[in-house]
Every structure is written in structure tokens, then in C-alpha cells.
Amino acid sequence: MSYNLKKELLKALGAVKRTLKEYKYYIKDTENEKAKLKKMEEEKKDESDITRQKYSVEETEGAKVQTYKTLVKFIAPLKEIVEKIESEDSNDEEFLKQQAEVKDMKEFIEAKEHIKETDEIISQEGATNA
């Protein structure tokens, strides 16, 4: 049987890293847009400007929600490959060799950290939306 654990790990990790970075950006951007809206309302700015800012907040929140959904979708394959790498169910020499090599990679440790961080985000979002 042919395995390519390293390639699988790097592909899944790359998708999660990009999406997690984007999600964090949208969290920050949403906070900034809301603060800007609040300031505009407090300063009693023109109603059309406030309306445009509300639209901007909605757009940013929509992008954040979509990115969150993508993150949830991408974390599953990363979890699967990490579980496969950590499993001790195989007697296949090729698999065991690759497994040992991948476990020593910094990307494997990074993958586990991103899984933990994403699980925390999912937990927080679940609590927020409950």
C-alpha cells in the first residue's frame, strides 16, 4: 500500500493555517467596524453614512461567518490525518516508517496546536450562538 503522510499533513495544515489567519483577521475587522459605527452614532453623523457603516459591519460579519464555516470544514481532514499518524494500529512497514518521520516534523506539532486552537474557537462560537 502506498502512503504519503507528509503530503497529506502539509496539504491539510496549509488549508487550516490560511483559513485560521483569515478568520482572525475578520474577528479584528468586525470589532473595528463595530467601533467605528458606534462612534459615528455617538457623534450623530449623517444617517446615510451610518447606514453605509451598518452595511459594512454586516458584510464583515458575513465574511467572518463564512470563514468560520470553511475553518470547520477544513479542520476535519487535519484531525483525521493527525489521528492516522498517532495511531498504532498498523503493521505495514512503509506506513510505520513514514509515521515515525512525520511525527518528528515541526509541522506535525503545529498541526496539533492548530487543532487545539480551532477546537477552542468552535467551542466559543458554539457558546456564543447557543
Model-derived segments and spans:
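Short, charge-rich amphipathic alpha-helices with coiled-coil/heptad character
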Residues: 1-15
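Non-transmembrane amphipathic alpha-helical segments
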Residues: 12, 16-19, 23-40, 60, ...
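A structural signal for well-ordered alpha-helices, especially hydrophobic packing surfaces
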Residues: 20-23, 61-64, 68, 82, ...
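Short E/K-rich amphipathic alpha-helical oligomerization segments
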Residues: 31-54, 76-86
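Short, charged, amphipathic alpha-helical segments
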Residues: 49-58, 96-99
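Amphipathic alpha-helical coiled-coil segments
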Residues: 56-78
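Coiled-coil termination/hinge junctions
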Residues: 72-98
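Long C-terminal interaction segments enriched in charged/acidic composition
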Residues: 91-130
